[in-house]
């Protein structure tokens, strides 16, 4: 392992100390709590939408969340390990067959819906 990778791992460990980043994938509906500074006070702003892309590049990892706001599609890119991202919460798992869901940009209404992924393993455990 080279020196740069070692430094990146240390920085990731420092940035994730005290917060957990859940495992999520494209198609999942997530709520990202973002720290917003207004004047001299800071507050958390919730941004809920569908993850349409995820980029795994160590410290430079990021993901794109798309939501419909007032009938208009809005996309926002978040750095996974940014100090401005307070929490990431997975609301719903999506069942998709693509890594990048850019085709959702051309779709609206019911055609832009994503089927929910059913977890058969946990359902079988609850029955027993």
Curated annotation (Swiss-Prot):
Care to name a GO molecular-function term for this sequence?
Answer: structural constituent of ribosome
Show the PROSITE patterns listed in the entry.
RIBOSOMAL_L19
Entry's InterPro entries?
Ribosomal_bL19, Ribosomal_bL19_CS, Ribosomal_bL19_sf, Translation_prot_SH3-like_sf
Could you list this entry's UniProt keywords, alphabetically sorted. Answer: Ribonucleoprotein, Ribosomal protein
Origin organism is: Azoarcus sp. (strain BH72)
> Which residue spans adopt a coiled-coil conformation according to this UniProt entry?
none
Q: What is this protein called?
A: Large ribosomal subunit protein bL19
Which top-rank group of organisms is this from? Bacteria
The Gene Ontology biological process annotation of the record reads:
translation
């Amino acid at each position: 392992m080279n020196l740069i990778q070692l430094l990146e791992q240390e920085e990731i460990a420092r940035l994730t100390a005290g917060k957990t980043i859940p495992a999520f994938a494209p198609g999942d509906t997530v709520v990202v709590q973002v720290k917003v500074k207004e004047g001299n006070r800071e507050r958390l702003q919730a941004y809920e939408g569908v993850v349409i892309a995820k980029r795994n590049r160590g410290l430079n990892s990021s993901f794109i969340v798309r939501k419909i706001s007032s009938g208009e599609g809005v996309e926002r890119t978040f750095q996974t390990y940014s100090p401005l991202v307070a929490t990431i919460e997975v609301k719903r798992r999506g069942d998709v067959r693509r890594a990048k869901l850019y085709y959702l940009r051309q779709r609206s209404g019911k055609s832009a819906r994503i089927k929910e992924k059913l977890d058969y393993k946990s359902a079988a455990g609850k029955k027993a």
